[in-house]
Design a protein with these regions (language model features):
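Helix N-cap and loop-to-helix transition residues
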Residues: 5, 118, 138-139
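Short, flexible active-site-adjacent loop segments at beta-strand->alpha-helix junctions, enriched
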Residues: 17, 88, 140
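Generic beta-sheet signal
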Residues: 51, 110-112, 139
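Acidic carboxylate-rich catalytic motifs and surrounding loops in phosphoryl-/glycosyl-chemistry enzymes
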Residues: 139-146
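Conserved beta-strand edge residues that scaffold enzyme active sites
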Residues: 55, 114-115, 143
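Active-site acidic carboxylates
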Residues: 1-65, 69-76, 98, 106, ...
Length: 179
């Protein structure tokens, strides 16, 4: 089997709370992308962490002892490849990404899986995060890069996810990934 280019992955879902639905630009499309990545994460055995903003400071949340133990266990295998989706692009997504980059991790910000109250904030935040060293990519691109090629056992499962979500992916891309 080919060696994966993305090692030690973990999916981070940032501040994706129902109470923000009315305020966030195209919230349902962010949720749809997060659901697709949750399904792929289950198929690919990628651990998932949900984060919320720490009200005292705009940083990655303070993990519970159980979550800290899980993260420490993952870190023992080397730096994480962190996949980020959620809201808001210029606040929680940015601060979480910067914290993870500073800790030495590789970060993949999923452009069709992030948004903000003001849609104009999104491309500015993504440009900044790219400049800081994050990989800004799409959910489909990430999934294909992770599985590598058709020889991997999970490839057919990911193809199925891609086909099942093709319409919602198209809509998210057309709305959230405008240049």
């Amino acid at each position: 089997m080919a060696q994966r280019r993305i090692a030690n992955p973990a999916l981070f879902i940032c501040d994706l709370q129902e109470k923000f639905r009315p305020a966030i630009y195209e919230f349902p499309k962010v949720v749809s992308t997060a659901q697709k990545l949750l399904k792929a994460s289950k198929l690919l055995n990628i651990p998932v962490f949900a984060t919320t903003q720490n009200k005292g400071r705009l940083r990655l949340y303070e993990p519970t002892p159980e979550v800290k133990q899980a993260l420490d266990s993952l870190n023992a295998s080397g730096p994480l490849s962190c996949i980020i989706v959620g809201i808001e692009s210029h606040i929680c997504v940015t601060q979480t990404t910067l914290d993870l980059l500073r800790a030495g991790h590789q970060v993949y910000v999923i452009a069709d899986g992030v948004s903000s109250c003001n849609k104009e904030e999104v491309p500015i935040a993504l440009a900044r995060l790219r400049h800081e060293g994050a990989v800004v990519t799409t959910s489909e691109s990430f999934m294909y890069e992770y599985v590598g090629d058709a020889s991997t056992p999970e490839f057919k499962d990911i193809i199925k996810v891609v086909k099942e979500t093709s319409q919602s992916t198209k809509e998210a891309m057309q709305t959230l990934c405008k240049i």
